[in-house]
Regions:
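PLP-dependent enzyme catalytic core of the Aspartate aminotransferase-like
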Residues: 1, 473-538
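Conserved N-terminal alpha-helix of the aminotransferase class I/II PLP-enzyme fold
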Residues: 7-52, 59, 69-138, 146-153, ...
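Extracellular distal adhesion/interaction modules in secreted or cell-surface proteins
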Residues: 33-81, 98, 217-227, 457-477, ...
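Well-ordered, non-membrane alpha-helical segments in soluble/globular domains
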Residues: 78-89, 103-110, 217-227, 252-264, ...
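Disordered regulatory segments flanking catalytic cores
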Residues: 102-120, 463-474, 490-492, 498
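Conserved PLP-enzyme active-site core in the AAT-like
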Residues: 131-136, 140-349, 355
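Active-site C-terminal subdomain of aminotransferase-like
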Residues: 300-423, 517
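Conserved small-domain helix->loop->beta segment predominantly found in fold-type I
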Residues: 369-483
């Protein structure tokens, strides 16, 4: 089956997943830099050269890469661009100040991100600001730090449960260390408050019932309203995090709910859009900022940049509010002055610390964003539509799969009545259970995890299959079940627009991924034994 790959400039000497010590000095320095300046999630195994997500810092061109909802390996084209860029930086640093070079270049990243999103302003205009971060989870921590004890009121953050967002989000959103090591390489006490006495708390809301079906918008809104009422009565401020989109491609809570709650509770309620999947158009992001919602983005999901890189966008109103806010001294272990906007008081707590790993990861992500935005929207819509229709039809007709319930991505409250079709209304993450073909029901969460892990193993005759890691979505009886996800990324869409057969090749490749997944599921269910740990009620 033909694979969609970028045949432009690429470094043939880079071995997929090879440990850095096997490569020549220049490449080794680049690969070490790409996985530096973050927490332990970036660490690569010395033997395999891969991190906990099964990805390394060098291109893996054979992979069937449909797992961008979790993580991606840098593309050959982005790697080539970053390699050239890094070589220039190293040459410049032979005679120049690395701190000054970093401050200039990370400032350019901020400028380029805002430019690509259509957020450039002239000097006399109020400006949108961007805080850069080493991951999306860090952004939740930064937002909690900025809002903690504003007007001397404790903060309560409200997020979706971690199965739809991220494993560390709830801890970060409560102002606590969410990993054991931070980007400065300092060890920290996971779960400990960044600033003692902030007393930030986090509440979570489920968007699915126990059987995996979706709760109604009304049910979710009533629960949220109750939580915010209790917070107000206790003298707390609230930050509501709206996820657009979640791990299983949900916009939740709904925008109608968010806007109604904002109208009801006013200034005591702030809203942040968790758009860390970055499956949004520039126009949608601008519309959110026009509502004075904060917007969290990352470069490592839809954009398929190397893990991890993040940004928190703040509208002019929010920027003015945050400009004078102090942050905990402990935040200096997470970021340096240059990652924060000039003129912000938060910079006073931070040091001049360069994070060239973050710089390179954002450079790769923006390379992919620029290529994606260069594709006419009608072509993007055509690719997304064809992919979604083909994959959905296969999942509905194949006895090996069960589609996970989802709902349309409704952003009509941003636009009003409009007949214009936007590319980000078409799902690029499609979630499904694996059925037990040797009995009844679906595979257990443990069996699904086994399928996922075995698919990712590269063999002599078979490329590794990269799909979105299992998401715990349901309990059938007392047995947990998880859904897998097949996803499009910006590089896949770009590649699908590059030739007469490219789109059909993309869909054929997706069908191969589903073939391989069904085969592995059948093997795992057979090995687990007939009737053992099966979910007969699914």
């Amino acid at each position: 089956m033909p694979q969609i790959v970028d045949h432009r400039a690429q470094d043939r000497n880079v071995a997929a997943g090879a440990p850095v010590q096997r490569l020549e000095t220049g490449q080794a320095a680049l690969l070490r830099c790409l996985i530096s300046g973050g927490d332990e999630r970036l660490d690569c195994d010395e033997t395999t050269g891969l991190n906990m997500y099964g990805h390394g810092p060098s291109p893996r061109q054979r992979d069937l890469a449909f797992g961008s909802s979790t993580a991606s390996t840098i593309s050959a084209a982005a790697f080539s661009a970053v390699s050239t860029y890094y070589s220039g930086l190293r040459h410049e640093m032979e005679s120049g100040s690395s701190a000054e070079i970093y401050e200039r270049e990370i400032g350019q990243i901020r400028h380029d991100l805002l430019r690509l999103l259509g957020l450039e302003q002239s000097p006399d205009q109020s400006r949108v600001d961007a805080i850069l971060a080493t991951s999306g989870t860090d952004i939740h921590l930064f937002a909690a730090a900025l809002l903690a004890r504003e007007d001397d009121q404790p903060l309560m953050t409200i997020t979706l449960m971690g199965n739809e967002t991220g494993s560390g989000v709830m801890m970060a959103a409560s102002g606590r260390h969410f990993m054991a090591r931070v980007s400065s390489d300092q060890a920290v006490a996971k779960g400990e408050e960044l600033r003692e006495g902030d007393a930030t708390r986090n509440a979570t809301v489920a968007v699915r019932n126990k059987d995996g079906s979706l709760r109604t918008d009304l049910e979710v809104e009533e629960e949220l309203r109750g939580l915010i009422e209790l917070a107000r009565a206790a003298g707390l401020r609230c930050l509501l995090v709206v996820t657009d989109v979640s791990k299983t491609s949900l916009l939740a809570p709904s925008l109608e709910t968010a806007l109604r709650l904002k109208a009801r509770f006013g200034a005591m309620l702030d809203i942040m859009i968790d758009a860390c999947q970055f499956r949004l158009s520039a126009a949608t992001i601008r519309a959110y900022l026009a509502h004075d919602f904060m917007v969290a983005l990352t470069g490592s999901k839809f954009l398929a940049g190397p893990i991890f890189s993040g940004a928190l966008l703040c509208s002019p109103v929010i920027s003015e509010r945050f400009r004078s806010r102090a942050v905990p001294a402990a935040l200096a272990d997470y970021c340096g002055k240059a990652e924060w906007p000039e003129g912000w008081a938060a910079r006073e707590a931070l040091t001049h610390r360069a994070n060239f790993g973050l710089l390179l990861r954002w450079k790769a992500a923006l390379f992919e964003l620029e290529r994606f935005f260069a594709i006419p929207e009608e072509k993007v819509i055509a690719v997304l539509t064809a992919f979604a229709e083909a994959v959905t039809a296969r999942l509905e007709s194949d006895a090996a799969f069960d589609l996970l319930e989802s709902r349309p991505l409704d952003r009509s409250n941003l636009w009003g009545a409009s007949s214009i079709r936007r590319w980000d209304e078409i799902p690029s993450i499609i979630s499904f259970y694996l059925r037990n073909t040797h009995g009844a029901g679906v595979l257990t969460a443990a069996e699904t995890a086994s399928v996922y892990k075995q698919l990712a193993i590269e063999e002599a005759e078979l490329a590794a299959v990269r799909i979105g890691q299992p998401v715990r979505c349901a309990d059938f009886g007392d047995v947990p079940a998880s859904a897998l996800r097949i996803c499009l990324s910006a590089p896949l869409i770009v590649a699908a627009c590059e030739g007469a057969t490219a789109l059909s090749d993309l869909i054929a490749q997706a069908m191969t991924v589903l073939d391989r997944t069904a085969d592995m599921a059948a093997r795992v269910s057979a090995e687990s034994g007939h009737g053992q740990a099966l979910l007969a009620s699914a």
